[in-house]
Amino acid sequence: MKPVFCGNFEYDARESDLERLFRKYGKVERVDMKAGFAFVYMEDERDAEDAIRALDRFEYGRTGRRLRVEWTKNDRGGAGRSGGSRRSSSGLRPSKTLFVINFDAQNTRTRDLERHFEPYGKIVNVRIRRNFAFIQYEAQEDATRALDATNSSKLMDKVISVEYAVKDDDSRGNGYSPERRRDRSPDRRRRSPSPYRRERGSPDYGRGASPVAHKRERTSPDYGRGRRSPSPYKRARLSPDYKRDDRRRERVASPENGAVRNRSPRKGRGESRSPPPYEKRRESRSPPPYEKRRESRSPPPYEKRRERSRSRSKSSPENGQVESPGQIMEVEAGRGYDGADSPIRESPSRSPPAEE
């Protein structure tokens, strides 16, 4: 009897679902379920041919997946095959672990498999994974004897399929052994660290993992400067021609300028300002209000008189000072008045001479 390969169905599909699907075309002897595919054994090959023609590329399941149904490429043998023919057809090396499929996954327990395989040798471990199981024997001869006796036998009204596992458990540690996790963990500890971990553990990772190196970098005089040139204010202070005159010290000590001078150039404020700040204030400071009033309004008569007197007294030490109107009157009274003649004084001098 040649099995029919059926694949591409949903992973949650059950053996009873496939059996019900193929039963429409003939009698189904058994279904060997795998992960994602199955082998369907039908009693008559002509019925199997009909099933292949009808079900290949057939949309099946909730998602409408297209089935792949065809003859198996290698003849897996019939129900009356022996263990020797089974091993020769599969080409697997004998091992201590047997691979069991096609049992009732919903109702079969570990104890049921132990009772079925115990008569042929001492069992080390039994593990069930969804719809397949692994039976591990203590000796390889016991596993061979169990395979010859239990393959195509009935377990809880199901015809099971038994074959050798791909690798031997205790020598290979391939995952079929119950010691899988204990075998893998020491290997992981002995394994060399990954390049990512080596990179993170190295002192050159990122900006430096060592706090000492970080402190050494911060205390360096070049830390944080990069390629930026010093601010104009710093260049003026570092210049040998920088002078600390008395007026500058007085302005720095004044409470008005202290708030501006205390701004740190490291915060980016001093770099955009022209050096030094107090010079800009001197140039940009507007004259006092009384000067604006004096410039905007027309000068009074005594200012005109003062301008004339200023041209004569440029050599005087008082030249350039702002004089009050009272001072101007005192000066004019002391040195003689050269302004416009008073009509009272001019009347006797401009009167026509008396006729003799």
Curated annotation (Swiss-Prot):
Q: Any idea where the RRM domain is?
A: 2-74, 96-167
**Where, by tissue, is this protein expressed?**
Leaves, stem, roots and flowers.
Q: Which SMART domains match?
A: RRM (SM00360)
Residue numbers carrying Phosphoserine: 192, 194, 210, 239, 254, 274, 309, 324, 342, 347, 351
Compartments in which it is found: Nucleus; Nucleus speckle
SUPFAM superfamilies reported in the protein's UniProt record: RNA-binding domain, RBD (SSF54928)
| Cellular component, GO, one term | nuclear speck
Q: Which InterPro entries match?
A: Nucleotide-bd_a/b_plait_sf (IPR012677), RBD_domain_sf (IPR035979), RRM_dom (IPR000504), SRSF (IPR050907)
Give positions of region: 4 X 12 AA tandem repeats of [KE]-[GK]-R -[GR]-E-S-R-S-P-P-P-Y.
267-307
Q: Which GO terms describe its molecular function?
A: mRNA binding
Signal sequence coordinates:
none
UniProt biased composition (Basic and acidic residues): 168-186, 238-253, 268-306
Q: What else is known?
A: The splicing pattern of the pre-mRNA is regulated in a tissue-specific manner and by development, and changes in response to various types of abiotic stresses.
Quaternary structure, per UniProt, is: Component of the spliceosome. Interacts with RCF3 and CPL1. Interacts with DRB1/HYL1 and SE.
- Spell out the family assignment given in the record's similarity comment: Belongs to the splicing factor SR family. RS subfamily.
Q: What does this protein do?
A: Required for constitutive and alternative pre-mRNA splicing. Involved in primary miRNA processing and pri-miRNA biogenesis. Binds both intronless and intron-containing pri-miRNAs.
Protein name as it appears in the record: Serine/arginine-rich splicing factor RS41
Q: Which organism is it from?
A: Arabidopsis thaliana (Mouse-ear cress)
